[in-house]
A protein has these predicted regions:
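Short hydrophobic-acidic sequence motifs that mark active-site Asp/Glu residues
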Residues: 62, 83, 111
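Conserved beta-strand signature within the Rossmann-like core of class I S-adenosyl-L-methionine
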Residues: 106-117
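Conserved N-terminal segment of class I S-adenosyl-L-methionine
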Residues: 1-80, 96-100, 105, 124-172
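Short acidic/histidine- and often glycine-rich active-site loop of Leloir-type glycosyltransferases
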Residues: 120-122
Length: 172
């Protein structure tokens, strides 16, 4: 299981707000495009796509279990999986399942952006929208466990988020 029915319902409610997740992120999409070119990736999965704004800039398959029009699970693998501002929203007891799922979709590379601070948004049940608020060191340990044969470059690009660039060394 990747998400509980209760949490999926809370997130569907949050995503119905036209302002939630609608921010354009051209600078981020440029960085993803550069990493795709550097790693010679042709296909891209936007995992946890929200409103799927990445598709306006990059040829991405959009998947998000909390947005009905993007909830169809993709078939097969992609050269790269981008998962931006998603992992901190995952239910802690299901994080392993989600990371295994991401790894299963990624043939060559991953581009992850993970917030390390509480969200401004609150779920309808009163919890902060970021269910996992952990520092870079914690994420580095978790990601290294789930991507053991990958070259991971983890940077703390600003005080509130980390960026992870992962390249598969061919062993999966």
């Amino acid at each position: 299981m990747l998400i509980s029915k209760e949490y999926q319902s809370l997130n569907e409610h949050l995503h119905k707000n036209p302002k939630y997740g609608s921010r354009r992120r051209e600078a981020l999409y440029d960085k993803i495009a550069d990493f795709m070119a550097e790693t010679e990736c042709k296909t891209l999965l936007d995992y946890g796509c929200g409103k799927a704004s990445m598709r306006e800039y990059l040829p991405a398959y959009s998947y998000d279990p909390c947005v009905p029009e993007f909830s169809v699970r993709p078939e097969g693998a992609f050269d790269m999986v981008a998962c931006c501002d998603v992992l901190e929203h995952v239910e802690p007891d299901l994080l392993t399942n989600v990371l295994v799922d991401i790894r299963g979709y990624a043939d060559k590379a991953v581009y992850l952006v993970i917030s390390t601070r509480p969200a401004a948004k609150v779920l309808a049940d009163g919890r902060n929208a970021h269910l996992i608020v952990k520092p870079l060191d914690w994420w580095q340990e978790v990601l290294t466990q789930h991507f053991p044969f990958w070259q991971l470059t983890i940077t703390n690009s600003d005080i509130s988020a980390i960026t992870v660039l992962g390249i598969n060394d061919g062993r999966r």
